[in-house]
Amino acid sequence: MGTGWSLLCYGPAALRPAPVQAAVQARLDALVAELSHWGSDSLLCRFNALAAGEGLDLPPDFAAVIDVALQVAAASGGAFDPCMGALVQRWGFGPPGQPDARARAPLQAWRELHWDAPRRHLRQPGGLMLDFSAIAKGHAVDCISALLVELGLPHHLVEIGGELRGQGLKPEGQPWWVDVEPPAPDCDLPALRIALHQLAVASSGDYRRFRIDEQGRRLSHTLDPRTGRPVAHGLALVSVLHESAMWADAWSTALMVLGPGQGLALAESRGLAARLVLREAGGWRQLLSPALRALLEDEA
């Protein structure tokens, strides 16, 4: 997935870290073998290479990701799209290498996918390139959290590429308190400090990956699937809290694409706990959804 991972967990005194680390790495390797768009031998890349009309019967992880991705795509009016691989490459934000000459980058590409959820069968309409970079890390966080519970380690904090999930409590009875990273060193807004107790947080923004074009304009790596271009509003960072890191991951991207007005409206209508940070001429401003305000009040 092109990123690193870390975890903190508490267990019995006899716990040996090495077997836990090995089990976590094996689970992550299996996910990468299915969901990664880095390289050419993953299941995702094999789907991208299928001819029109061909399909795959998907294993559970891949099926779970595409199912949630298409739900968020529909609920957001196409602001989230798992079929942006070709578009991302054309803007220079994808993996290194030459893009597939057969790849297409139609707007609202997700609508062309043929997904049979009961059969877990996905059919390639021809030339579409899946890219799960806005959802796969969240799913991996959920999977590792579930694995740790299976290993008898229900008290843990998992982080993959900046997406986090906390489960259980620390030994002193406190939840896992985390501070969400600010969008820039000069951001003077108070830190978003939250307790991750059976809760995940994921963020999307232009503060890490962007480039400057020939006119000196800042181009966000977040692309709008509805226009095929980088988003051009003032949002610098969106953070979403959810029981599932996968859902938080996808929703944060959708809200980032929609912008402050439509993004906050969607968060309110879906009951999402979201923080939207805007970069403005006079400094920084934040918008908090009602669900996040209620959550922060409960923690105060």
Name each region found by the language model.
Residues M1-A300:
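Mature catalytic core of soluble alpha/beta enzymes
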